[in-house]
Swiss-Prot record:
The keyword Cytoplasm does not apply. Residues 1-330 are annotated as: Receptor binding site. It comes from Murine coronavirus (strain JHM). Disulfide bonds join 21-158, 153-187, 165-246, 284-294, 329-354, 372-425, 384-475, 805-816. This is Spike glycoprotein. GO terms for cellular component: host cell endoplasmic reticulum-Golgi intermediate compartment membrane; host cell plasma membrane; membrane; viral envelope; virion membrane.
Length: 1235
């Protein structure tokens, strides 16, 4: 019902009240001028307009508080109206009838000295409410003599109320001159407060928050104190200062003042003294200097450059668009039709591309109540929809409860179901029963039994479905305004067919709109453009500037100099970015618009306290401000702390020289990291876990209080913590992060399966193990493995020595004969070249005896030595086999003997164990007979024990299970804490590694961060980090600082000063790259002094406390204690305790172990040797033939070119000159010549 009255307010209030009271004055229709605006601005510096926070005291504190305060520097409006005996009808309408919104601050003049004798009211009455009728509450503060009568009641406010300073009812039954009530109204508060009647001004602070109304009061221009508060539950929407009717005393004038300014929710900086009194207040968003004060939380901020963040372009106009000349939907005609269906056969009608007035509709159908689902009812006014569908049917008054949202009554179960996910409003209204015909009754005549009529009216229900909010041309006209012109190039507030916001319009030519389309969106759902259906023009919409403003503030200046970064001044002042309408001076720089400073960038300063970046500096001089009235004292200059050519002149190191290794080369590293951010959620049925389905246990569990509730509460907290952390991680991932996946790389199979070891060679300590013998040990290359074949043979100690001797030269075969136990031996394996050589020698010896007999000697020796080598190897293997067989036989005998001894010992042990087991069984039987509480079954306990004992046993079981459950819950809490920390770490790594490139070493992977990717993983995130890791370093002499000319110091910025070829240069800490020292890589210091601080030495106390002896503690505990042992009367004589004697068996086992140890096989060393076999002779023959062919080819080329004949001629002349001409001598028979 409340929504209906609120929504009907704009159309039903012609004046403030609903009833015309008996008036003692006249009224007319003369127009009244608008409320005057004060020349005095709101000044909150001393606390005026603020209030003391309820129930809080602050001493000697400066802190930020958020509340409902006026805007510092704003103006007051005078809402006081005065007359003698005549009222104007225009006084009771806007703008005097004003919106209350968050609240108001009022500065009221006390007129006691100007009112006539006998006057009871010294200032006007104020009323604050919504409907000002007997169906809603109204707050009234009415003066009477020296008190303020405050009340919150359901008053019926008069249509033309006023405040007389000297009441005269003339005998009429008038309660006052502002309300009339036949019977006493319902009141939430009625109290009287005294005030200082001698104070010239009174100050009131009214605001509402969360349905509660607060009132504060002061009689001095300072912070107000608490007056009263009351919970109303309704939203107060309007207030009105009643006209003050009074005839002043002769010779004086009466001009009441009721200055009012609205309140907003704002942040203030307060300063409290030692008595808790507010001495200073600052509105943080009122000016640039105020934001600096709030940013530093100091009323006297220090000199520096501050980044201001609370500045957004203020709109300078309004663009309002609705489709013109749309017909009326006429929804009310269909709602008031004579034929109304029953719930079984409800009807629906859809309205589209038309206008409707919700206020008129509700008034027309005489609505009883209106409530909305998934939308605020007050927001429906003025909105547009794609379409509006209305379902209606008659309903008995007694069954209306079935249609409540979330109810599963009979009507929603069998007839009409309300969709709770849809945006809809539920309307109950009634029509005269004589004008309505109910049709389509249910066959069971259920509705006939309940009936639809109450007090001669038919009860009807309508469900209004609002489809496509702010996306169509079916609009409510309650708050509709006329269309305005589209202002381009400036920041404006817009309402385009129900879509509201602010932005900058720019006209463009676009052909991508269809005839039914008017709005353009981007991929994120933001409005990016629109087509004006009135003019058919198209526009793009860009957001208004919301950027960074740097304020250079000097503590001796009253205001700062400003730098609007990355925008020019024309945009700043065209779009009302600056709070200053007419700044003293401003200009454009390449950093942005500079305000309140002179342009002196052609000048350079060596020192600067206000650095703006990019080598620019703001300088302030108080004398310059006083001398030149057109200057604020600030100027923008160039900052040059030193000249580069002076760096190496008269330079001394500050703090000494140090050797440091700086990386010079890097390699890219890959690191994968998993971080858990979530875990499975757990819920426990505590009662079922502890008691199962046992009723007695569950009943006894109740006595344990809220333990089970606490368990579920803790688990819910754990689950909520997991949800919140997952939402935070998801939020971090959704803001500019794409979950990465491996891109196709054209390689079949995973990348990790590619083996790069053949390209990289042997790496690490496993080279010898993986190199297969001498190839790795002797450094055999991969080419040798490719060109030669390999063969393995047994080596008893001479093969490796032979190989070392030959060094790969096979002609040294017989020279490297080895001696083994006095016998000369050679390896039994021959290469192809060796076989060819020895075969050729043997063949020559056989073909030309006796002259070539000596050629067979190497072959014979080779064969004999190799047979010796083979025999020696076979002999060693045979001896080893004999040793193995003998040792194995000895081991089998020892093992058999050990098994015999073990079997004998186990037999004895078994007999003893069996005997003791029988004795223990007898003991348990006795215990079982004496005590019945053996089983843990609850049912058995209940059936076998009496009530007291059963309860004790159930308590024991419950305590045990609750202890286990408590331990589990504790573990869940600790695990959730770990997950919370790991999720926070994941968010940090998403922000610092994925979204940016961190400067932290080894935080995003190992080394300096390059790139990070994030992938989903079970219960967490998998980060893939790429970083570059140093591989080589440069040792350089570094200095923590330099001293120039003995009085000016320099410190490196993110690096070091190094000596490079006798000159000082700068290099980064991550990479050695000397570069000249400039202001970009260094920081200037005012002196060269170094302050040394020594950290205190702290040692942990490692002494052990002197604890008392356990015996002493037990003696203290047992002191004065008396214990009586129970008489169990057990038959202990039946327990036959047998002592084992296993000495002989253990000795036998020891002998067997000794024999096993003696069976160690000391085999003669037989190694495995790997040798390389070269290619066969025909391969080398082919290679030789190829070489001969190449030589012949070269000779042929020489002959063809003429080079060959020249060479032969020279050779021939040389021989002739040396020996002369001789006849050839031929010897025919060598043997005859010898004779």
């Amino acid at each position: 019902m409340l929504f209906v009255f609120i929504l009907l307010l704009p159309s039903c209030l012609g004046y403030i009240g609903d009833f015309r009271c008996i008036q003692t004055v006249n009224y007319n229709g003369n127009n009244a001028s608008a409320p005057s605006i004060s020349t005095e601005a709101v000044d909150v510096s001393k606390g005026r307009g603020t209030y003391y926070v309820l129930d809080r005291v602050y001493l000697n504190a400066t802190l930020l508080l958020t509340g409902y305060y006026p805007v510092d520097g704003s103006n007051y409006r005078n809402l006081a109206l005065t007359g003698t005996n005549t009222l104007s009808l225009t006084w009771f309408k806007p703008p005097f009838l004003s919106e209350f919104n968050d609240g108001i601050f009022a500065k009221v003049q006390n007129l006691k000295t100007n009112t006539p004798t006998g006057a009871t009211s010294y200032f006007p009455t104020i009323v604050i409410g919504s409907l000002f009728g007997n169906t809603s509450y109204t707050v009234v503060l009415e003066p009477y003599n020296n008190i303020i009568m405050a009340s919150v009641c359901t008053y019926t406010i008069c249509q033309l109320p006023y405040t007389p300073c000297k009441p005269n009812t003339n005998g009429n039954r008038v309660i006052g001159f502002w309300h009339t009530d036949v019977k006493p109204p319902i009141c939430l508060l009625k109290r009287n407060f005294t005030f200082n009647v001698n104070a010239p001004w009174l100050y009131f602070h009214f605001y509402q928050q969360g349905g509660t109304f607060y009132a504060y009061y002061a009689d001095k221009p300072s912070a107000t104190t608490f007056l009263f508060s009351v919970y109303i539950g309704d939203i107060l929407t309007q207030y009105f200062v009643l006209p003050f009717i009074c005839t002043p005393t002769a010779g004086s004038t009466l001009a009441p003042l009721y200055w009012v300014t609205p309140l907003l929710k704002r942040q203030y900086l307060f300063n409290f003294n030692e008595k808790g009194v507010i001495t200073s207040a600052v509105d943080c968003a009122s000016s640039y200097i105020s934001e600096i004060k709030c940013k530093t939380q100091s009323l006297l901020p220090s000199t520096g450059v501050y980044d201001l963040s609370g500045y957004t372009v203020q709109p300078v106009g309004v663009v309002y668009r609705r489709v013109p000349n749309l017909p009326d939907c006429k929804i009310e005609e269909w709602l008031t039709a004579k034929s109304v269906p029953s719930p079984l056969n409800w009807e629906r009608r859809t309205f589209q591309n038309c206008n409707f007035n919700l206020s008129s509709l509700l008034r027309y159908v005489q609505a009883e109540s209106l409530s909305c689902n998934n939308i605020d009812a007050s927001k429906v006014y003025g909105m547009c929809f794609g379409s509006v569908s209305v379902d209606k049917f008659a309903i008995p008054r007694s069954r209306q409860i079935d249609l409540q949202i979330g109810n599963s009554g009979f009507l929603q179960t069998a007839n009409y179901k309300i969709d709770t996910a849809a945006t809809s409003c539920q309307l109950y209204y009634s029509l005269p029963k004589n004008n309505v015909t109910i049709n389509n009754y249910n066959p069971s005549s259920w509705n006939r039994r309940y009936g639809f009529k109450v007090n001669d009216r038919c009860q009807i229900f309508a469900n209004i479905l609002l489809n496509g909010i702010n996306s169509g041309t079916t609009c409510s006209t309650d708050l509709q305004l006329p269309n305005t012109e589209v202002a381009t190039g400036v920041c404006v507030r817009y309402d385009l067919y129900g879509i509201t916001g602010q932005g900058v319009f720019k006209e463009v030519k676009a052909d991508y709109y269809n005839s039914w389309q008017a709005l353009l969106y981007d991929v994120n759902g933001n409005l990016n453009g629109f087509r004006d259906l009135t003019t058919n023009k198209t526009y793009t919409i860009r957001s208004c500037y919301s950027g960074r403003v740097s304020a250079a503030y000097h503590k001796e200046a009253p205001e700062p100099a400003l730098l609007y970064r990355n925008i020019n001044c024309s945009y700043v002042f065209t779009n009302n970015i600056s709070r200053e309408e007419n700044p003293l001076n401003y200009f454009d720089s390449y950093l942005g618009c500079v305000v309140n400073a002179d342009n002196r960038t052609d000048e350079a300063l060596p020192n600067c306290n206000l650095r703006m970046g990019a080598g620019l500096c703001v300088d302030y001089s108080k004398s310059r401000r006083a001398r030149r009235s057109v200057s604020t004292g600030y100027r923008l200059t160039t900052f040059e702390p030193y000249m580069p050519m002076l760096v190496n002149d008269s330079v001394q190191s500050v703090g000494g020289l140090y050797e440091m290794q700086i990386p010079t080369n890097f390699t890219i590293g890959h690191h994968e990291e998993f971080i858990q951010i979530r875990a499975p959620k757990v819920t426990i049925d505590c009662a079922a876990f502890v008691c199962g389905d046992n009723a007695a246990c569950r009943q006894q569990l109740v006595e344990y209080g809220s333990f089970c509730d606490n368990v579920n509460a803790i688990l819910n907290e754990v689950n909520n913590l997991l949800d919140n952390m997952q939402l935070q991680v998801a939020s971090a991932l959704m803001q500019g992060v794409t979950i990465s996946s491996r891109l196709p790389d054209g390689i079949s199979g995973p990348i990790d399966d590619i083996n790069f070891s053949p390209l990289l060679g042997c790496i690490g300590s496993t080279c010898a193990e993986d190199g297969n013998g001498p190839s790795a040990i002797r450094g055999r290359s991969a080419i040798e493995d490719l060109l030669f074949d390999k063969v393995k043979l047994s080596d008893v100690g001479f093969v490796e020595a032979y190989n070392n001797c030959t060094g790969g030269q096979e002609v040294r075969d017989l020279l490297c004969v080895q001696s083994f136990n006095g016998i000369k031996v050679l390896p039994p394996v021959l290469s192809e070249s060796q076989i060819s050589g020895y075969t050729a020698g043997a063949t020559a010896a056989a073909m030309f005896p006796p002259w070539t007999a000596a050629a067979g000697v190497p072959f014979s020796l080779n064969v004999q030595y190799r047979i010796n080598g083979l025999g020696v190897t076979m002999n060693v293997l045979s001896e080893n086999q004999k040793m193995i067989a003998s040792a194995f036989n000895n081991a089998l005998g020892a093992i058999q003997e050990g098994f015999d001894a073990t079997n004998s010992a186990l037999g004895k042990i078994q007999s003893v164990v069996n005997a003791n087991a029988e004795a223990l069984n007898n003991l348990l039987n006795q215990l079982s007979n004496r005590f019945g509480a053996i089983s843990a079954s609850l049912q058995e306990i209940l059936t076998r024990l009496d009530a007291v004992e059963a309860k004790a046993q159930i308590d024991r079981l419950i305590n045990g299970r609750l202890t286990a459950l408590n331990a589990y819950i504790s573990k869940q809490l600790s695990d959730s804490t770990l997950i919370k920390f790991s999720a926070a770490q994941a968010i940090e790594k998403v922000n610092e590694c994925v979204k940016s490139q961190t400067t932290r070493i080894n935080f995003c992977g190992n080394g300096n961060h390059i790139l990070s990717l994030v992938q989903n993983a079970p219960y967490g995130l998998c980060f893939i980090h790429f970083s570059y890791v140093p591989t080589s370093f440069k040792t350089a002499n570094v200095s923590p600082g330099l001293c120039i000319s003995g009085d000016r110091g320099l410190a490196p910025k993110a690096g070091y000063f190094v000596q490079d070829n006798g000159e000082w240069k700068f290099t980064g800490s991550n990479y050695y790259y000397p570069e000249p020292i400039t202001d970009k890589n260094s920081v200037a210091m005012i002196s060269c002094a170094v302050n040394y601080t020594k950290a205190p030495e702290v040692f942990l106390n490692n002494s052990i406390p002197n604890l008392p002896d356990f015996k002493e503690e037990l003696d203290k505990w047992f002191k004065n204690q008396t214990s009586i042992a129970p008489d169990l009367s057990l038959d202990f004589e039946k327990l036959n305790v047998t002592f084992l004697d296993l000495t002989y068996e253990m000795n036998r086992i020891q002998d067997a172990i000794k024999k096993l140890n003696e069976s160690y096989i000391n085999l003669k060393e037989v190694g495995t040797y790997e040798m390389y076999v070269k290619w066969p002779w025909y391969v080398w023959l082919l290679i030789g033939l190829a070489g001969v062919a190449v030589c012949v080819l070269l000779f042929f080329i020489c002959c063809c070119t003429g080079c060959g004949s020249c060479c032969f001629r020279k050779c021939g002349s040389c021989c002739d000159e040396y020996g002369g001409h001789q006849d050839s001598i031929v010897i025919h028979n060598i043997s005859a010549h010898e004779d």
